[in-house]
């Protein structure tokens, strides 16, 4: 049974960086994975790509041939793939049936593709039907949107709409969480925003933003959106810093539960011990995100830097290369995680 992540999110939310981090992380735990680029405009991929939509269609060609702008060209490209999907699915089939690969789909950043337009949804539904892939949507959103109450409310609406549109297991993630403290102090604790607690507490802050005549009209709209999100009560968030190994480990544990990977890992192979630990709940960190990313961020960052320095020294003592690559760092982070959980992964 094949499994996959569909990585979506607004432009600049760190989707390609996350996919690259996933590739390194899965290599470290022994999970055979492949990344699929679904963005016809992305010609500078930071990761090795197994299947690239640009081999079928590119944004530059569409814009030139159809006289379309970037957004229109992207919509046209995805529609074209939707209408002639057979060869693309054949390549995906080879990855999941012959290579037994866990897939990560790196999607375009235009939000209308996963909130209002049906082509991207149709593509994944066809793959789900023909290949029986168990998907989980990972919706990355820059944590900067937490700094403004009205922007936070708008992001909640975007996340809700994406969940309803894609109709798949869905994990919303505030990315670049290591940058949040530099944006200024938040009026509430971090878990207020990740758990989407009582939104009525935001009302006085929304009123402050809407002091002008036009702002007051937007305040009424924001209030209506707030009520809608509260009525559905579906949205919540995880947090992620790709450079922080523990937050990445924690997120992958959550995703593996969402798409059912922990119950079918033996059919994929390569990381059954990780899957067993996930089933037992050992990989889900029970740490205070307010403490880690706001109150004592500098302390935790210093500890991480000390660990990295110690690893470099260890490599030097073993007469290995001084430059520790990402997979070495993942191996080290996983060993530390195992020690905390009192287990020993066999890789």
From Swiss-Prot:
Transmembrane helix: is it a keyword of this entry?
no
UniProt EC number:
3.6.5.-
Please state the protein's primary subcellular location. Answer: cytoplasm
Name the GO terms of the biological process aspect.
Answer: establishment of mitotic sister chromatid cohesion; protein import into nucleus
Where does it live in the cell?
Cytoplasm
InterPro entries attached to this UniProt entry: Gpn, Gpn2, P-loop_NTPase
Where, in this chain's numbering, is GTP bound? Answer: 12-17, 175-178
One Pfam family, short name = ATP_bind_1
Q: Result of mutating residue 112 to K/A?
A: Impairs heterodimer formation with NPA3/GPN1
| GO molecular-function terms, A-Z | GTP binding; GTPase activity
The record's Gene Ontology cellular component field reads: cytoplasm
Name the residue ranges of motif: Gly-Pro-Asn (GPN)-loop: 69-71
Q: Which UniProt keywords apply?
A: Cytoplasm, GTP-binding, Hydrolase, Nucleotide-binding
The record places the site described as Stabilizes the phosphate intermediate at 71
Task performed by this protein:
Small GTPase required for proper localization of RNA polymerase II and III (RNAPII and RNAPIII). May act at an RNAP assembly step prior to nuclear import. Required for establishment of sister chromatid cohesion.
How does this polypeptide assemble, per the annotation? Heterodimers with NPA3/GPN1 or GPN3. Binds to RNA polymerase II (RNAPII).
**Extra info from the record?**
Present with 9230 molecules/cell in log phase SD medium.
Homology family: Belongs to the GPN-loop GTPase family.
Instruction: Give the protein's recorded name.
Output: GPN-loop GTPase 2
Q: What is the lineage of its organism?
A: Eukaryota, Fungi, Dikarya, Ascomycota, Saccharomycotina
